[in-house]
């Protein structure tokens, strides 16, 4: 049984009782692939445990006619999964980290952040525009994305293009692109395309100097009940130290800015030679006003260690007792410091105006 009498049960296999751990996921194909990836890692580590996957729809999956930034909820893709966790219907849930708010509801924590894949965005072109780039698309070409972050950065660089909202899962968006004439291209996360096996559709990768990425993009997170020590220990070994530290810095930056999907905020992190570099930016909705800065902190990528004290508080919703606390705090401080620098330079005005304009659109 799990540490707090949770959903973990036992099942009989070959005459012996196997522990069963229930894993919650969204129903989309990409979410299932991501969950299967995490479960495969856990099965390798724990061959004596049976993992049962339970799929469910979330608010973000159900409301498909409205841009995410307009729906007005912060837990669009996590709330229903957290409800199942709270009711002990599942023991852990797998998310894209970029969907997980920087402040989690009481009683929950991110127990693992897996090794990050490419965090950048990619452009997928309509078949008749294959071989083009955003720069060489014809005047007034429509480019599909529902991300304020992408639009704010790209509208300024490519004023000849028209950016239009497009919702739905990856399959739906690609179908809209290929079968209708509305869009010349759409913008998606590289990691999602790779996980779906659609690398061949990537027509252009947008590097951070062209378009910085979302906080946590490209990383998978495992959310658990905060007091379920047994499950925390079980999943904690999946923490990738470098990814963890980069994402703590990114999430601390976003939290201190009080950002979310209703304002254009983007980041870029690099770990090199014992230094963690964090670049963060904020934009007005049309990209005409922006502010970016870079800061760095000395942080050696640690190896995993024996678990630290059990009463360690979470950092930006994350519990990682097997990663040295000092490194985590240094990453968090870096994010807070960069956000403070931007706020002191007037970033709050940019974000406030962006919020107000987004509310009235």
Curated annotation (Swiss-Prot):
UniProt keyword annotations, A-Z: Acetylation, Cytoplasm, Heme biosynthesis, Phosphoprotein, Porphyrin biosynthesis, Transferase
PROSITE patterns: PORPHOBILINOGEN_DEAM (PS00533)
Modified residues (N6-acetyllysine): 74
Superkingdom field: Eukaryota
CDD domains with a match to the protein in the record: PBP2_HuPBGD_like (cd13645)
Pfam families from the UniProt entry: Porphobil_deam, Porphobil_deamC
Record GO cellular component, one term: cytoplasm
InterPro entries linked: HemC, Porphobilin_deaminase_cofac_BS, Porphobilin_deaminase_N, Porphobilinogen_deaminase_C, Porphobilinogen_deaminase_C_sf
Biological pathway: Porphyrin-containing compound metabolism; protoporphyrin-IX biosynthesis; coproporphyrinogen-III from 5-aminolevulinate: step 2/4
Residues with the N-acetylserine modification: 2
Major site of localization recorded for this protein: cytoplasm
Keyword Electron transport set for record: no
Cofactor(s) recorded in Swiss-Prot or TrEMBL: dipyrromethane
GO MF terms held by the record: amine binding; carboxylic acid binding; hydroxymethylbilane synthase activity; uroporphyrinogen-III synthase activity
Record-level GO BP terms: animal organ regeneration; astrocyte differentiation; cellular response to amine stimulus; cellular response to antibiotic; cellular response to arsenic-containing substance; cellular response to cytokine stimulus; cellular response to dexamethasone stimulus; cellular response to lead ion
Coiled-coil region(s): none
Catalysed reactions listed for this entry: 4 porphobilinogen + H2O = hydroxymethylbilane + 4 NH4(+)
Activity sensitivity to pH: Optimum pH is 8.0-8.2.
Note describing how the cofactor binds: Binds 1 dipyrromethane group covalently.
Modified residues (Phosphoserine): 69, 147
Modified sites of kind S-(dipyrrolylmethanemethyl)cysteine: 261
EC number: 2.5.1.61
Subunit relationships: Monomer.
NCBIfam families per the UniProt record, alphabetical: hemC (TIGR00212)
Its biological purpose: As part of the heme biosynthetic pathway, catalyzes the sequential polymerization of four molecules of porphobilinogen to form hydroxymethylbilane, also known as preuroporphyrinogen. Catalysis begins with the assembly of the dipyrromethane cofactor by the apoenzyme from two molecules of porphobilinogen or from preuroporphyrinogen. The covalently linked cofactor acts as a primer, around which the tetrapyrrole product is assembled. In the last step of catalysis, the product, preuroporphyrinogen, is released, leaving the cofactor bound to the holodeaminase intact.
Name of protein: Porphobilinogen deaminase
Gene name in the database record: Hmbs
């Amino acid at each position: 049984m799990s540490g707090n009498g949770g959903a973990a049960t036992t099942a009989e296999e070959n005459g012996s009782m196997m522990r069963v751990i229930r894993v919650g996921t969204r129903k989309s194909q990409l979410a299932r692939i991501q969950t299967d990836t995490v479960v495969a890692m856990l099965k390798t580590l724990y061959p004596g445990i049976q993992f049962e996957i339970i799929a469910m729809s979330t608010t973000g999956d159900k409301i498909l006619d409205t841009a995410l930034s307009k729906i007005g909820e912060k837990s669009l893709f996590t709330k229903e999964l957290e409800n199942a966790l709270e009711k002990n219907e599942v023991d852990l849930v797998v998310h894209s980290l970029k969907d997980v708010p920087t402040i989690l509801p009481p009683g929950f924590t991110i127990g693992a952040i897996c090794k990050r894949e490419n965090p950048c965005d990619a452009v997928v072109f309509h078949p008749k525009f294959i071989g083009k780039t955003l720069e060489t698309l014809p005047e007034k070409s429509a480019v599909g994305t529902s991300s304020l972050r992408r639009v704010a950065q790209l509208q300024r660089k490519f004023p000849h293009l028209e950016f239009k909202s497009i919702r739905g899962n990856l399959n739906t968006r690609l179908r809209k692109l290929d079968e209708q004439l509305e869009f010349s291209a759409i913008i998606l996360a590289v990691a999602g395309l790779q996980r779906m096996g659609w690398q061949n559709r990537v027509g252009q990768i947008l590097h951070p100097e062209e378009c910085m990425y979302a906080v946590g993009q490209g990383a998978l997170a495992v959310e658990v009940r905060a007091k379920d020590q047994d499950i925390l220990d079980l999943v904690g070994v999946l923490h990738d130290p470098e990814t963890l530290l980069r994402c703590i810095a990114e999430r601390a930056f976003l939290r201190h800015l009080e950002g979310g999907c209703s304002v254009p905020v983007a980041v870029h992190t690099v770990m090199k030679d014992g230094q963690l570099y964090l670049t963060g930016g904020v934009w007005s909705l049309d990209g005409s006003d922006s502010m970016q800065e870079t800061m760095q902190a000395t942080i050696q990528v640690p190896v995993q260690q024996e678990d630290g004290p059990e009463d360690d508080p979470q950092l930006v919703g994350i519990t990682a007792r097997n990663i040295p606390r000092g490194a985590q705090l240094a990453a968090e401080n870096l994010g807070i410091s960069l956000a403070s620098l931007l706020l002191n330079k007037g970033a709050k005005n940019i974000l406030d105006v962006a919020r107000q304009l987004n509310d009235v659109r």
